Amino acid sequence: MRNVSMTERIIEVVRNTNETKIRVRLNLDGSGQGTLNTGVPFLDHMIDQIKRHGLFDIDIHCDGDLEIDDHHTVEDCGITLGQAFAQALGDKKGLRRYGHFYAPLDESLSRVVVDLSGRPGLFMDIPFTRARIGSFDVDLFSEFFQGFVNHALMTLHIDNLKGKNSHHQIESVFKAFARALRMACEIDPRAAGSIASTKGSL
C-alpha cells in the first residue's frame, strides 16, 4: 500500500496473489473519474456505478485467472477496493460515518445503509429473478461485497425491495451503495475533527 496523499484522501493499493494481481488508485474526494479494467466487463460496469454516483475517482487494473472462472477476480477486486477505502479514510476523524440511500431503476428499488463502524458485517437480501446476467453469475455479487466490507471494516445492509429484471436489481443496488458510501465518507464540518462514536474510536 502506498499513501499518495492523506491530506487529499488519495491512496494506491497493490495486491498480488497466485490468483490475481490488482492495482487500485482511489481518491475519496474526486469527481467520478477513472479507468476500470478488471477483465470482467459486467464487474467494470458495476464499479463504474460506484465511482460515478459516489463521485470517487477509481482506477483499477486486475490480471486474474479468468481461465478458471470469474470468482477470484470478483472477490479480490472487492477485497482490494475495500483495503483502499480503509486506508484512504485514515483515522476517520470528522466523518459522517453513516450513509443511506434508496435508488430506483425502472421497476427495481434498492435500499443500502452503510456504517463505517470498524466492524465488518454484510447483510444482503437480493431476490434475483435469474441466476446469470449474461455470463455473470449473480452469486459473485455477495463475494464482492463480502470482500469489500471485510477489508473496509464497515457494516453494510443491502436490500432490493422490488424488482423483476436482475440487471436492474443489481444496478440499483450499486447506485444506492455508491450514494450511501459517499454520504458516509463525507467530512462533516460541524464535527471539528472528532470521531463519530461515544467510544472515541471507529
Swiss-Prot record:
Could you provide one GO biological process annotation from this protein's UniProt record?
L-histidine biosynthetic process
Report the top EC class in one word: lyase
- SUPFAM superfamilies, sorted: Ribosomal protein S5 domain 2-like (SSF54211)
Q: Name one GO molecular function term.
A: imidazoleglycerol-phosphate dehydratase activity
Q: Does the keyword Cytoplasm belong to this entry?
A: yes
- What does it catalyze? D-erythro-1-(imidazol-4-yl)glycerol 3-phosphate = 3-(imidazol-4-yl)-2-oxopropyl phosphate + H2O
Q: Which UniProt keywords apply?
A: Amino-acid biosynthesis, Cytoplasm, Histidine biosynthesis, Lyase
One GO cellular component, as annotated: cytoplasm
- InterPro entries with a match to the protein in the record: IGPD_sf, ImidazoleglycerolP_deHydtase, ImidazoleglycerP_deHydtase_CS, Ribosomal_Su5_D2-typ_SF
Q: Which domain of life is it from?
A: Bacteria
Q: What is its EC number?
A: 4.2.1.19
User: Which family is this protein grouped under?
Assistant: Belongs to the imidazoleglycerol-phosphate dehydratase family.
Per its record, how is this protein called by name? Answer: Imidazoleglycerol-phosphate dehydratase
What organism is listed for this UniProt entry?
Acinetobacter baylyi (strain ATCC 33305 / BD413 / ADP1)
Q: Which gene encodes it?
A: hisB
